[in-house]
């Protein structure tokens, strides 16, 4: 029995190692950023023993799927070897979106969202608040409040004529609230939208901007 176990142990370890390697090779990430310096250059994902292909970081769309070197890695500027963010992926799942928002203790903070699943569907909005004030509002009949440095999925309802939503965005200052935008957003059944709220130094107010992601019909 002992001899059998001694022979079997290396085989099991080899299988486990191969499985872990396959897991790492199968993890895909799409990136976008709230903002980026003009001279940032290409980025790489780095672990102790692996390094990804370099890629450009967009701010108006998502990257093509990038192969992650593991579930825990550093994001660096390739040209300067400058650490930008630490990224920790969930233990399960192999397809993610990573939003890079302005960090407190590092240039970026990574916000990880599963790419597939019922939690974030076509037609939904993911709102992330990097500003110093709570953000509140409504998309159609769906209301929301988002604390600073947090985010949530908003599933809109109550479209007008099935074509657009009345959208009201505002901030809370102390016990009072005030509007920062009133507009209409179109109903988009094949698009998911990421909305960043941030402190705008030019306007000296909370600003926001959106990144749309087209989701093909075969994707959930």
Pin down the residues of each PLM region.
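Positively charged n-region of N-terminal signal peptides that target proteins for export
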Residues: 1-4
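Bacterial N-terminal signal peptides
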Residues: 6-15
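Intrinsically disordered, low-complexity polar regions and short flexible loop motifs
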Residues: 20-220
């Amino acid at each position: 029995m002992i001899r059998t176990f001694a022979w079997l142990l290396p085989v099991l370890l080899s299988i486990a190692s191969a499985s872990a390697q396959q897991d790492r090779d199968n993890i895909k990430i799409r990136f976008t950023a709230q903002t980026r310096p003009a001279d940032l250059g290409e980025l790489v994902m780095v672990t102790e023993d692996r390094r990804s292909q370099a890629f450009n970081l967009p701010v108006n769309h998502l990257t093509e799927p990038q192969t992650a070197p593991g579930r825990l890695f550093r994001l660096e500027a390739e040209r300067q070897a400058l650490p930008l963010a630490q990224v920790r992926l969930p233990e399960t799942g192999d397809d993610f979106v990573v939003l890079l928002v302005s960090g407190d203790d590092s240039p970026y903070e990574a916000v990880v969202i599963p790419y597939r699943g019922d939690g974030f569907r076509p037609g939904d909005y993911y709102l992330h608040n990097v500003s110093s004030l709570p953000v509140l509002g409504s998309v159609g009949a769906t209301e929301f409040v988002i604390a600073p440095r947090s985010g949530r999925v908003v599933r809109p309802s109550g479209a007008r004529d099935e074509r657009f939503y009345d959208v009201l965005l505002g901030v809370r200052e102390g016990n009072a609230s005030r509007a920062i935008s009133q507009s209409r957003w179109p109903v988009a059944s094949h698009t998911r939208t990421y909305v960043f709220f941030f402190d705008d130094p030019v306007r000296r107010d909370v600003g926001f901007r959106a990144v749309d992601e087209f989701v093909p019909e075969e994707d959930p």
